[in-house]
Amino acid sequence: LAYIGGSITQGAGAAPINTECYAYKSYQLFQKRFSAKNNVKFIKAGVGGTPSELGMIRFDRDVLRDGQQPDIVVIEFAVNDEGDETKGDCYESLVRKVLNLPWKPAVILLFSVFANDWNLQDRLSPVGKLYDLPMVSVLDAVSPQFALKNDEGRVITKNQFFYDMFHPGNAGHSVMADCIEYLFEKIDQAGHASLNAFELGLTEEKILQEKLNLAPVIGNSFENIRLLDKKDIYAKAYIDEGGFDSTDTQLQSVEMDDQLSLTPEFPYNWMYDGTKNTLNRVKAYFELEMECRALLLVFKDSGEVNVGKAKVYVDGEYHFTADPHINNWQHCNAVIIFNNKTSENHVVRIEIAEEDRDKQFTILGFGYVL
């Protein structure tokens, strides 16, 4: 069982974070229901404050690490994707990326909820409907009963469910796990072939494949996205790292799987450090040349005063400025540099703003679609 998502999947609000989070609890419930030998493996890859725009880039590294082939993947980004530039294209791309894996894992879409009874399930649920995926809505499960009194059928109050505005506490994580267990129960009771399998003579896998051949409901621009960093180099990419010759070790780190220890995200990065090396200030740029259809930059946000801005140019034209202080806390930020219809050769230059040459900036990696 694998789980990918934001801070709720990471376990925020649960104590201890590794065993009281919904992911671990639902994995235990799955094992209790289906496993006779306690031989179910648990993969957890939640990263706080990050949307599916980052999730689709880090999926291979974080979920499929060490040759893992999960049979079930739970995707939880319904409260993280408000800032998604593509309004759902990244989410559907991630879903399709998982569904298209050679061993055909099952996918569950999980819609968490904030304390103001908000999530993005109205935007994202059409993706589940198109591919006939099971969807678990925590909003539908808990929000309607919050307004009731005890004698009217209220099961849990908002204060009991939530640790803060954005994250469930231990009780909330337990309820989320119960919601997923309810899905397991329903699936366990259901027949293993859908009605269509008898009518059309097709297996469920073939029906899914036909749906994957249909036009996406939002978009699939990034379903073949790959990660490019110092570890996963693309042979046909030409890189001039310029002054980005250091490696940043002060990174957003998360509790993976059932561990309490922290694992850094994107450790194979390129860091410009103008605080130590004055020679670097002469070469305050990084250049990447490659043929691709789409390219995303992943850079490090930070609240530190010694971190500066970088300007992003494509083929000599200014596109945008990457500013770590907009979010102002240490975390991974994925932004689209370009997303085109056809693949062409481009030169991307990332240049430290002139007034920030004595500061630091970290390129965590790139996501690219050929």
Predicted regions and their residues:
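Active-site segments of SGNH/GDSL-like serine hydrolases
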Residues: E76-N80, C90-P126, L130
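Cell-envelope and extracellular/periplasmic
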Residues: S7-I8, A12-A14, I43-D60, Q68-G83, ...
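Serine-esterase "nucleophile elbow" of acetyl-processing enzymes
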Residues: L1-A45, R58-Q69, L297, T342, ...
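Loop/turn elements at helix/coil->beta-strand transitions in domains of secreted/extracellular proteins
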Residues: K37-K41, Q68-V73, P102-V107, Y131-P134
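Alpha-helical scaffolding within the catalytic cores
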Residues: A23-F30, S52-D66, G88-K97, N119-R123
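Catalytic His-Asp segment of secreted/periplasmic serine-dependent ester chemistry enzymes
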Residues: A115-P216
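Conserved catalytic region of serine esterases and O-acyltransferases that act on ester linkages
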Residues: S174-L370
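Sec-exported extracytoplasmic/periplasmic mature domains
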Residues: Q31-K32, D60, L64, Q68, ...
